[in-house]
Design a protein with these regions (language model features):
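Structural signal for hydrophobic packing residues in well-ordered secondary-structure cores
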Residues: 6, 10-17, 45-55, 82-86, ...
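Short, small-residue-biased leader/transition segments that mark boundaries at the very start
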Residues: 1-2
Length: 184
């Protein structure tokens, strides 16, 4: 019900007009919005510092980070934290039955949304197109926008794509994936 109410506000022309008259704009901070990813980076810096302060690790010790994800946003924030210097060894994507990311990592870089969609007890992970993965592909490909655009075109037209081996090697050295179903 809350989701429908929020969605209604975003599509209600009268509400949007009233906000506009007051010089306001309504925005969302979902996981494809950079405004949501930026503060998530701080979670990983803070968590690392907390482990240091508790004596769980020593400065410079690498940690593994496991993040439940469907849209690849929060785990991408962890990747950014790693790029900024947080010693993270592996970034582990935990998925539900809609395990498109797990299959991407296990297949060596083939992303295939052509599969049954499962409605699960983790609806925020019920996703077959992980839009933030596109950002990672852009970064690890050396900002190759033409390659990424071609992959996204393939995804749109055929429902799948395979990343070049050299790009996946960079990804595969840092990420892995796993999944469980609702029973597990």
């Amino acid at each position: 019900v809350l989701f429908r109410s929020v969605k209604k506000i975003f599509t209600d022309k009268d509400s949007i007009r009233k906000l506009d008259e007051q010089g306001m704009t309504l925005s969302s901070a979902n996981s494809i919005n950079w405004g949501r990813l930026a503060p998530q980076i701080a979670y990983y810096v803070s968590a690392y510092c907390d482990m240091l302060n508790r004596g769980d690790i020593q400065m410079g010790d690498a940690i593994n980070v496991c993040v439940p994800t469907g849209n690849f946003g929060n785990i991408l924030a962890a990747y950014f934290a790693k790029q900024m210097g947080v010693p993270i060894a592996k970034l582990i994507c935990a998925s539900n039955e809609n395990n498109v990311l797990t299959d991407f990592f296990r297949s060596g870089g083939t992303y295939d949304r052509n599969r049954p969609f499962h409605t699960t007890i983790s609806p925020s992970m019920d996703i077959l197109i992980s839009s933030n993965l596109e950002r990672l592909l852009f970064l690890v490909s050396g900002y190759n926008d033409a390659m990424v655009a071609d992959l996204m075109k393939q995804l749109d037209e055929t429902g799948k794509y395979s990343v070049p081996a050299d790009v996946f090697e960079t990804i595969g050295n840092q990420f892995e994936g796993g999944f469980c179903d609702d029973v597990q």
